[in-house]
């Protein structure tokens, strides 16, 4: 295959990935989708990002047994985008983002928890920046663009949507270390069927 043909294939793949992303983004935000679908959209986002920045972001995803579960639509891309903008982009030489999903039992034994972790090996945050994020997440009011950057407001939106659907004990938890990276954990009940948004596990019924 010639260089020109290779470029044609690359452009075609970019157009397809962009088209699928646009189609996904313009749908109703309140939809529940499979976790695997969310991961696929994240892969396409990072693919398009790497086309622009010469492949400086390595994305890894692991969701053994959890891909079939349902999650609120558009909860992962804002977190992954945040990881790139604030973690990987300021770091020389690029970096990696790991998205993992696992089902864990709660101590009370009543519900199972889906925990999705987004980790990057970027520049990390100092305590002041981390405190600002924690303050934003803990607040009852939506983030104000003049006070917070728009990526953080995207994280706040995801956090609030999860809590609205499932309860205040769920949502986002953030930890970070300067020079090591940032970890964002999304916690929600296991949802095994579309439309099940009450935090109850129907397994075995």
Each predicted region: which residue ranges?
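Intrinsically disordered, low-complexity acidic/proline-/asparagine-rich linker or regulatory tail/stalk regions
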Residues: 196-205
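Two-component histidine phosphotransfer core
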Residues: 1-175, 183
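Short C-terminal beta-strand
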Residues: 182-190
């Amino acid at each position: 295959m010639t260089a020109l043909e290779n470029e044609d294939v690359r452009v075609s793949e970019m157009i397809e990935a962009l088209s699928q992303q646009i189609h996904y983004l313009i749908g109703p935000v309140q939809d529940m989708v499979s976790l695997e679908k969310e991961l696929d959209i994240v892969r396409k986002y990072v693919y398009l990002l790497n086309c622009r920045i010469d492949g400086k972001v390595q994305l890894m995803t692991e969701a053994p047994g959890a891909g079939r579960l349902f999650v609120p639509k558009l909860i992962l891309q804002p977190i992954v985008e945040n990881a790139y903008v604030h973690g990987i982009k300021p770091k020389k030489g690029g970096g990696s983002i790991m998205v993992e999903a696992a089902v864990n039992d709660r101590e009370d034994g009543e519900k199972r928890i889906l925990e999705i972790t987004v980790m990057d090996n970027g520049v990390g945050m100092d305590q002041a920046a981390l405190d600002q994020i924690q303050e934003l997440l803990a607040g009852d009011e939506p983030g104000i663009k003049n006070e917070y950057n728009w990526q953080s407001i995207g994280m706040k939106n995801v956090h609030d949507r999860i809590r609205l659907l499932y309860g205040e004990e769920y949502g986002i938890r953030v930890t970070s270390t300067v020079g090591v990276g940032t970890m964002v954990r999304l916690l929600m009940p296991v949802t095994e069927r579309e439309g099940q948004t009450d935090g109850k596990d129907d397994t075995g019924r």
